[in-house]
Amino acid sequence: MTLLNPFFGEFGGMYVPQILIPALLQLEKAFVDAQEDPAFIAEFQELLTEYAGRPTPLTLTRNLTKGTKTRLYLKREDLLHGGAHKTNQVLGQALLAKRMGKTEIIAETGAGQHGVATALACALLGLKCRVYMGAKDCERQKPNVFRMKLMGATVIPVHSGSSTLKDACNEALRDWAASYDNAHYLLGTAAGPHPFPTIVREFQKMIGEEAKAQCFKKEERLPDAVIACVGGGSNAIGMFADFIDNKEVRLIGVEPGGHGIESGEHGAPLGHGSKGVFFGMHSYLMQDKQGQIQESYSVSAGLDFPSVGPQHAHLASIGRAEYVSITDKEALDAFQELAKSEGIIPALESSHALAHALKMARSEPEKELVLIVNLSGRGDKDIFTVADIFEKEGTLS
């Protein structure tokens, strides 16, 4: 029996081989115990403040929304140590692993940000680290591969399937099934089998808690909408969690539209997928009529995932959150626009959320909107990818 509810409505669960059930139940018990231990909470908070650099600022853009009455704020997770929101929950899970007596950490990564965050946490806490990464993503994200190795992690390229994040996830789970006695699988997003979606949300929810308090201080009211990109869904659930009960605040998740939904080359299971079981959970996923997982696509490695966390599936099904898609081109335009107008280079993942916020502001220029975009990471890792695209298209003006 689980201690916590493994489902969000009909979504979630523990659809894993029997061999992994004891490991998941052990993890759940350790998490519940840790959440009730003031010493654990204090150590986690100290690491977030003194090592990671929380709280992160809520920055009002000065130039981006000129010509509209929108006040657009950026929640600056890009300023966190490690360069993205990933550091938050990685520190929490790594502390949990030490508490459980584990000596090794297994992780998967797409854009490399989760791998970097895991490597830095393992270096800090004295844990061995191995990271599975799709071979295609290793090519797309060479700077992050080097960062991981520099901090002592072993990076294992995965050549099976589409050589991307879903394949890295499968290999990491296989490894954990054989080594969970001394290893913890440090999952990088709010997806997968219970208790991972709950653990990751709880270790990310300070994003929304801070943003809410900061918005009250600056605007003396709640925002009209909070907007975040959605791959597996950790940065979005971190932003949404504290606003779920504030029904007047729109929760908008932005999935990768890739080359356009009609092309079939996208990563938008919530908007254009169907229900099924994948990666240990029941959620929405991209699958064919035979139930075979279809390959997702996005210019952004961190959003290139064919499913989504179960809490997002639930929020979509009850109408509490809305999920839209943004194409590669729209995200690349927003990437360049933020850099030129504010001097901030965002991650390609975050650029999807930014692009939708700009659409909202410009579609109703006379409306006095207060919008918060979760700028989930910085764009250093993406500059070579973007430079190649801009060079081919001749679009760097």
Curated annotation (Swiss-Prot):
Q: Which organism is it from?
A: Aeromonas salmonicida (strain A449)
- A single MF term (Gene Ontology): tryptophan synthase activity
Question: Domain of life of the organism in this record?
Answer: Bacteria
Obligatory cofactor(s):
pyridoxal 5'-phosphate
Supply the CDD domains for this chain.
Trp-synth_B
Query: Which keywords label this protein?
Result: Amino-acid biosynthesis, Aromatic amino acid biosynthesis, Lyase, Pyridoxal phosphate, Tryptophan biosynthesis
The family this protein is said to belong to: Belongs to the TrpB family.
**Catalysis performed (reactions):** (1S,2R)-1-C-(indol-3-yl)glycerol 3-phosphate + L-serine = D-glyceraldehyde 3-phosphate + L-tryptophan + H2O
What sort of enzyme, by top EC class, is this?
lyase
Its ancestry begins with:
Bacteria, Pseudomonadati, Pseudomonadota, Gammaproteobacteria, Aeromonadales
Task: Give one Pfam family.
Answer: PALP
Q: Which Gene3D superfamilies match?
A: 3.40.50.1100
One Gene Ontology CC term in the entry: cytoplasm
Q: What does this protein do?
A: The beta subunit is responsible for the synthesis of L-tryptophan from indole and L-serine.
HAMAP family for this protein? Trp_synth_beta (MF_00133)
Which residues are annotated as modified residue N6-(pyridoxal phosphate)lysine in the UniProt record?
Answer: 86
Q: Which pathway, per its entry? A: Amino-acid biosynthesis; L-tryptophan biosynthesis; L-tryptophan from chorismate: step 5/5
Q: How does it assemble?
A: Tetramer of two alpha and two beta chains.
EC number of the protein = 4.2.1.20
This protein's name: Tryptophan synthase beta chain
